[in-house]
Amino acid sequence: ATFLTSVSSYEGGCGFEVYFRNLHCVPRQLYGIKLMLGAELNILNTKGDIDLDEDYWRMLDIRIAGIHSLCWQGGSKEENTQGVINAMRNPFVQIISHPGDGTAELDFEELMKVSRETHTLLEINNHSMAPIRHKTVAAPNNLELLELAKKYETPVIFGSDAHFSTMIADYSNIMPLVEKAEFPDELVLNYQPEKFMAYLKPTPEK
């Protein structure tokens, strides 16, 4: 199983509304691979507001939300954390993208507790740790997330965050952290598609 998402249009991604409206035309099974199509939505502020209208959320198979610097109106560490928690409590949001990339200062322990409570997965993001991104806090932050996930026995999802076709399923920056944290395979939902589908929190009916 593979899920493909485009950043929603608020951040200037390719995902204008008509793009998401047309996703129903795409087969959900191609070349023996099950596809889930969705959006990486923008968390806009410390209230946890998400962009795109709810009508579009309902059209998607998978809904990821994350903080992006171009449209994020942040505050203190506590305020930022509460904004992400509010987004996690949104019944449509199933995954929080790259919480460890350093765009906003966050309390990872609080996020992990809410992840366990709400079944909103936290992503361990490969691309944010690429040398070309110059995000020096990304690796230590993601290591902390792995250690907390292990402590609280909370599953995570690995994301390649591929910005080009050759980057798809590239987890080369994640694996050294997995080894360092001695992170158990059973908490990585990428390895268990059936468990991933069962773990995702149910969203409101379309």
Predicted segments with their positions:
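Extended substrate/RNA-proximal surfaces in nucleic-acid metabolism proteins
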Residues: V7-I124, E179-V188, K195-K206
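Short acidic/histidine-rich active-site segments
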Residues: T154-I168, V188
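Short, conserved active-site loops that position catalytic residues or coordinate cofactors/metal ions
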Residues: A1-V7
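Histidine/acidic-residue-rich catalytic or RNA/ligand-binding cores of hydrolases
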Residues: S9, G13-C14, E105-K113, I132-L148, ...
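Active-site proximal loops enriched in glycine and acidic residues that flank catalytic Cys/His/Asp
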Residues: I124-N126, F158-S160, Q192
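His/Asp/Glu-enriched short active-site or ligand-binding loop at hydrolase and phosphoryl-transfer sites
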Residues: L121-H134
